[in-house]
Amino acid sequence: MNIKRAKQEIKDAVQAYLMKDEYGEYQIPAIHQRPILLMGPPGIGKTQIMEQISRECEIGLVAYTITHHTRQSAIGLPFIQTKIYGGKEYSVTEYTMSEIIAAVYEKIEQSGMKEGILFIDEINCVSETLAPTMLQFLQCKMFGNQSVPEGWIIVAAGNPPEYNKSVREFDVVTLDRIKRIDVEADFDVWKEYAYQVGIHPAVLSYLELRKENFYRMENTVDGKMFVTARGWEDLSRLIQVYEKLGKEVDREVVHQYLQHWKTAKDFANYLELYRKYQKEYGLERILAGYYEKDTLERLKFASFDERLSVVNLLFGKMAELFKEEYEMEKFVEGLFAQLCAYKEELQKEGAVPGEVLAAKIQSLRREVEQKKAAGQLTKTEMHRMERILCKLEEYQKAPEFESVKATFDSEEEQREQMADKTLETLNHCFEFLESAFGESQEMAVFVAVLNSNVYSIAFLRENDCAMYYKYNKGLLLDERREEILEQMDAVENVVERGLVED
């Protein structure tokens, strides 16, 4: 299955394991809560989905890569303890608490969350001395003589043997005690994540044209050659920073991240073309509603790769606007919620505006720090909360509610202006694409990416765009027509097989 489905399966299992009955006991006792084993190629986002699940379920997360540990750190250090058995004194070996189990208790203390996920990565790549410990961990949920705290779900991840020479196969006894999920790389699913985290448009545009290069793993006489989703994401970050620094990303730089020479060379060549199209087509003018007939003529006779690159360039610019508008929307919503609570506090007898607002800021800052310590905030959410706190601190200059409301109204007006500007730019995009391509495959691609980006979906849900509805309706009809034809072909094949058998 793909990583998106795997995430949902793990999330569902975690929610089921943590569900309690009317007596406050877990519906599925800890002994029957099978550890979840996520098996898949490296670099496809196994660790990232653990972070997402912990935030969405509002539980803790402790993550360890077990190959970084020795037997001593995993099960604890031995020490001699004196005990009396049958009236005689004996020296016995005890163990200190496992570093991993101690980290779980530390997380509980820091975050106040008594339930969570203990995630162990590369579990099937441990050394020979640690292998028995891992079997004990999966079978008994213990490290040494210490059990995993109640309410903490075990999730482990590993790589199939073809990706790692150090892999150790689990026996049937162990496999019969776990919930195994096999996951594969899937570009279309990764693309949704890529839009959320802001992967460079050139990377997404290239992979739309060369999906086969999204994930590659080959054995050659010179060793393994590979490309992973992690490699594309890290390369994207570098390109974005290099652009700000005015530095060049050539094939040598690309190969440092995409360790498959043919793919690295192909992407480096595409990146040069991408920048060329960016300059020659005058995207900023197109987004503003101005373009020349020569531009339309050139596109009509351009190669499919070039036409699709221009479509992706336009969407890359739109994606930035959609994300900016989304963040403005969330900022205003968050600020509005704080001001509603502030207004309610002011209605209490003896409330002093300045003191109430100061207390509100202090309370919110504590909440943010607690969520940050618990890993419950993304980087974007932290920036948004800091922005809200800064705005509340500005309100302290004139804390009377009428003054605060007047300032907030200007924020709301800016949000509306931004939404109007984004809608206007989107319409300009559609007008250009309509003039250049009409109801074509290129238009279908543009509508499809609009439907796969979380920020554009959120925008179109709140803002009516007639041209989007027009072409989206056509796209849905085409998809439905293809689905019906596929069903008819399937029925026809079944009938033909039946006739042959008769």
Stretches with model-predicted labels:
Residues 35-37, 57-67, 80, 89-116, ...:
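Conformational switch/transducer regions in large eukaryotic molecular machines and scaffolds
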Residues 300-502:
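Terminal-proximal interaction/regulatory segments of ATP-powered molecular machines
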Residues 8, 12, 16, 55, ...:
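Charged/polar, solvent-exposed surface patches and flexible loops
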Residues 2-9, 36, 171, 186-189, ...:
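General structural signal for secondary-structure boundaries
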Residues 1-212, 217-220:
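AAA+ P-loop NTPase catalytic core and its hallmark functional loops
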